Design a protein with these regions (language model features):
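Non-catalytic structural scaffold of enzyme domains
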Residues: 6-292
Length: 292
């Protein structure tokens, strides 16, 4: 089962709703899971999807390096593309960089954090797992979420070093083996006297790209909590619902742009995958890691 975190929730918009430009930012292609939900929620919007593949994976950076990298890249992206709102579609970055970004830029930033609270509410066995990157697992922010919202649950924090890269490879046309994927998700599944894990939080936006394989390979059925629908609803809260679509009935998918800061992994299979998601235009805006 998959869960929409804010299903049924209605908000009053606090910004104008006329064809906004939305920048979706991630270290790689994981944020495409968020982009897809945003495109459904605001099909009239003008989208820029920015993948900082020159800095991927963010887990290799220290906290100070990560903050400096994201702020520097965001400086250039905002200058070039002038978005009305930015979505940081990356858990690892969101847990650190939202305060400095909000302080530096006078536009709204929507972040992505582990969905521990809804997972705890959904669990019947009171056993949940948070499947994340090592960086997200190590953050005090993540542990504070567990202590605050899941104190009554047995929580397994799983920091996978390989899943984000496996998800990238999947879209680039070089999928990893089932054995590799299973080895990364297996620690999520606890089975003891208190019962089995019944909810797994996908605390990296890359991971839903592999969700069909997770569901097939899991040792037993669980609820997988994907943050993307909730992020889209938060954006609609800020921007409002679309006033109307184009008079000719077409949306703005043909105007959406995918930007890569490195481009080494932009293969033909990836271009096809981007095009299938409404990102037919691809640009390389070189921002080497050492020079960001």
């Amino acid at each position: 089962m998959r869960v929409d975190l804010l299903a049924g929730t209605v908000y009053a918009p606090c910004m104008g709703s006329e064809a906004p430009k939305i920048l979706v930012f991630d270290s790689g292609v994981g944020g495409l899971t968020v982009f897809s939900e945003l495109a459904k929620a605001r099909p009239d919007a003008r989208f820029v999807y920015a993948a900082d593949d020159a800095g991927f994976p963010y887990g290799r950076l220290t906290e100070d390096e990560l903050v400096a990298r994201v702020v520097a890249v965001m400086d250039r992206l905002i200058e070039r593309h002038a978005p009305d709102l930015v979505v940081i579609a990356c858990h690892t970055a969101s847990t650190l960089v939202l305060p400095p970004l909000r302080q530096r830029f006078p536009i709204p930033f929507v972040g992505t954090v582990p969905a521990v609270k809804p997972a705890a509410a959904l669990s019947r066995s009171r056993r949940i797992a948070v499947l994340a990157t090592p960086g997200t697992v190590a953050r005090d922010y993540t542990r504070d979420l567990v202590e605050t919202y899941a104190a009554g649950c047995a929580v397994t924090l799983v920091g996978s070093r390989r899943l984000a890269a496996l998800a990238e490879a999947e879209l680039m046309g070089a999928p990893g083996s089932d054995e590799d994927v299973l080895a990364e998700i297996a620690p999520c599944f606890a089975d003891g006297e208190g019962g089995r894990t019944d909810v797994v939080v996908l605390a990296c936006t890359h991971y839903p790209l592999l969700l069909p394989r997770f569901e097939r390979l899991a040792p037993w059925p669980v609820t997988w909590v994907d943050p993307a629908p909730a992020i889209a609803r938060r954006v609609v809260q800020l921007l409002g619902a679309p006033a109307d679509l184009r008079a000719d009935g077409e949306d703005r998918e043909d105007e959406a742009l995918a930007v890569f800061t490195g481009g080494a992994g932009v293969t033909e299979p990836l271009r096809r995958a981007l095009g299938a998601r409404g990102l037919a235009r691809v640009a390389i805006e070189s921002m080497p890691l050492a020079q960001a």
